[in-house]
């Protein structure tokens, strides 16, 4: 990566993927009856969405 913009683009994609996968793990843990671990993965998904929003704001994304 050679520019901040390129770094932010990669960061946005990475955080999107992380939020999706953490959500899937939370669902899997929920279906196994492991509510505590499910809650942790949901929290991690929320953090990923927060990081994604921050990267998008820094990159100048607009809704």
Describe the predicted segments one by one.
Residues 1-63:
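Non-heme di-metal
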């Amino acid at each position: 990566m050679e520019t901040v913009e390129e770094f932010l683009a990669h960061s946005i994609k990475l955080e999107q993927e992380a939020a999706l996968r953490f959500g899937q793990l939370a669902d899997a843990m929920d279906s196994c009856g492991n509510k505590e671990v499910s809650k942790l993965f949901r929290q991690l998904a929320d953090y990923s969405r927060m990081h994604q929003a921050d990267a998008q704001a820094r990159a100048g994304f607009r809704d």
